[in-house]
Amino acid sequence: MFLRRRNLNSSRIICIISIIVLLLIIISLYPHKRTQFGRYSRRQKTIRFQHSTGEIGDQLFSLLSHLGVAKTLYRIPVINSANNSKLIDTLSNAMFTRFPSILQQFLIAIEPPTAVNRELGIENSSYEDPLTKFSEDTSSSLMVKGNGFKSFKYFDNLRSDIRLWVLEDAESVLEAQNLITKSQRNNFKICVHATLESNKNCSVKAIAQILNHYTNEYEDVMLIIASPFPEFTRFIFTNSRIRKYKTEKFSLISSSPEMQIIFSRIYCDVVFLTVPYSTHGWWMGYLAKDDNSHVFYFDPDMFPKNRTANQEDYFPPKWKKLSRKIQ
């Protein structure tokens, strides 16, 4: 038994080391991708974040907030891969596969663990101005702890770059493009994101209103549902409020959350979040097809138990909030 446990532990250590080495090799192959922060030297100040290992939406908030704050403070963004196996495993599963250009913006280091020495957005606040908190901080290295960094304000200064980074993996882009036929690619696409918490009856009323508006403006409208629950999709597609509009219908049920985000970046002209605090849905809206793509979300007060961020910090001001009283 002792030998078997030791062999299992050895195998896991070898696996983790292999992942770290692979990340370092891949990132080293793309030195031109990290010119945003200049060449790193030991004299430059660095910043590390205590990163989320949750779903892809949480990971994006954490990583991109790290990058945005680093740029604001003129510090090098560092991810320490040593003694951080859970984070490395998480990044390897989705970020490394689908969004490698985002990881290429970081310096991936193997160094002794760094203790948390700063906090940002902790006390019931999604956003705190990093300049106000850290601009006079002369420490060579900051290790920042937060509450998930769920605010676009941390990284909105990088939005144009982020929109490019999510499209830089050619294989992922091709996979997303091929989810629909060539004849459907020029349709005007309304993308609806749903979760287990989505209210079917409220959602169908809102979708009907959205369809009523856009089918009067565009001839070829396509309704796309991004939900892992076939019951929700079936309810929407077969409902009489929806069927009266002439639209093509498509489900992304077989696509991973990260693939749905890439699909939204390529195709979604309109995004509707039926559960406003879903970080996966949020990124579908933030990275929709165009800078001026319309994003709608239900009033967060409909979901008091799901509140994870301040509304003013979480939702960009251009997004449109839909009332619970929608008819």
UniProtKB/Swiss-Prot annotation:
GO terms for cellular component: membrane. The chain crosses the membrane at residues 13-33. It comes from the Eukaryota. This is Uncharacterized protein T25D10.1. Disulfide bonds: none annotated. PANTHER family: PROTEIN CBG02648, UNCHARACTERIZED GLYCOSOL TRANSFERASE-RELATED. Its main location: membrane. InterPro entries: Alpha-1-2_FucT (IPR052501). Keywords: Membrane, Transmembrane, Transmembrane helix.
